[in-house]
Amino acid sequence: MARSRCVHRVVHQAACIGVIGLSTSALTTCDFTGIFVAIQSEVPIKTPSIPGAIYGLVKAGSKLYATNGQLWKKNVAEEGKDWERESCFDSVIGDSRITSLAADNGENGVLVACILGKGAYKWSQGSADQTSGNPSALSGTEKALSVVGTGTSCVYLNHTDDKVGETSSSESGGMTASGETNEFCLHAGNGFLVTTKKVCVGSDGSPVAKSDGEEPVPPILAATDDGSGHVYILTKDKVYCKKVNQSEGKIQDCPQSAAAAPEPTGAHSVAHKVADAHSIAFFKNGSDEFLLIGGRQGYGEIKLERGSGSNGNGAQCVHLKEENVHDQTGWHEKGSTPKGSAEQYRSTIGRWAVSGIYVIKKSTSGGRGKRSTSTDCERPDLYVAVGDTNDTYTGLWRFDSAAQKWNRE
C-alpha cells in the first residue's frame, strides 16, 4: 500500500452497513436474577455519558473519539471524566449520522468520519488540541457506507456502487476500477487488507490476494493485527493467523527458522468456541498476548504463544493452540478481565452481545499519576460496545484497571 495520502474504495451493497452496526436484538434472550442483582448493587452501574449504541471508537492524537451517530470526545489522559460532544462535523451531518470513524495518521490527530449519504470527511484538531478549520470532504466518497483506517495516511472506504477502486484524498479525480464486486473492507494495515472474501497484500496502492498456506473459509467476519505483521482473521467457527511477507508480496502461514522446533499441527488456526462471533481485537498486557472475540454473550479469549523461531522479519511465530481457547474472559490474571473480576464481568457485559472491542494503548507519561508501577502502565485501556435492546447495558463500557471492575462510560 502506498504511503501517499489516499483513499481506497472497496465495494459493498447497501444491505451490509458495517459489522459494528450489526443488530443484536435477537442475539440474547437470557433472564438473569439472584446473584447478578446482588453483584450489581455492590458495583452501581453508571449513567452513560454517550447514549445508545456505539458504531466506532478511535484514538487520534491525544483524544479518543466515539460515535453513536454523533461525535463524542475524551482526553486520553483524563481518566474518570465523562465523554463530551464534539461539533466539528455537525455542519455536514444535518439529519444524517456518522456510521464509522478512522484515524488518518492517528498520532497526528487527524480524524476521518463517514457520514451516511454525505461521504467521508477529514478534520484535524490542530495545535494544542484546538480546532483546525472546517472538515474537508474526501473526493469521490459520496456513496461511502463506512471507513476503515490503516494506521498510516490511507483509509479504505466501503461503497454502495458496484466497483472497487481508489481515489486520492489530496487530489480531485475519478475512480479506477481494480477488483471484485460485493466486498466489504473489515481491517487494514500498512501493506495488507482484509475483506469479507479474502486477505490481500501489496504496497502499490492496489493490494491483491496472494496467499500461501491454510485459507480462511469465507465469509470473513472481522480481523485485527498485532503490529508486528501477524494478522488474525475471524470466521464463524475459527480464528486464523497469517503473516504479511512484504519482501515477497504475499500473506502466508508463519514460517519457522531452520533452527527452530517444528511448529505444532494446526498452529495457524483454531476453533474459537464463541457463539455468533462478530468482532475481534488484539490485547497485550506486559508480555502476555490475547485475542478477544465478541459474540452473543460477552467475549471469549485466546492466549497467544510465540515460538522460538524467527519469521525473518524480526517477530517470533505465533501459535494458536486449542488449550488456550476460552469462550469467556476472566480465566487468567493477566487477561483482559483478570480472574478476580470474572464474577462481576459475568453479571454485566458477560450477559449481553458484544458488538465491538477497542484496545487503546497507553502512554507511560502525562496524566498517569494514578498508576503506581510501570507494569500497570503496560496494560492498555479496554472498551467494549454492548449492543442489545436492554437500555441498562447498551452502549460503551470500560474496564477500570484501578477498581478492577467493568462499568458504563
UniProtKB/Swiss-Prot annotation:
A lipid is attached at C30 (S-diacylglycerol cysteine). Residues 1-29 form the signal peptide. Keywords: Cell membrane, Lipoprotein, Membrane, Palmitate, Signal. It is found in: Cell membrane. A lipid is attached at C30 (N-palmitoyl cysteine). Its main location: membrane. Belongs to the TP013X lipoprotein family. This is Uncharacterized lipoprotein TP_0133. It comes from Treponema pallidum (strain Nichols).
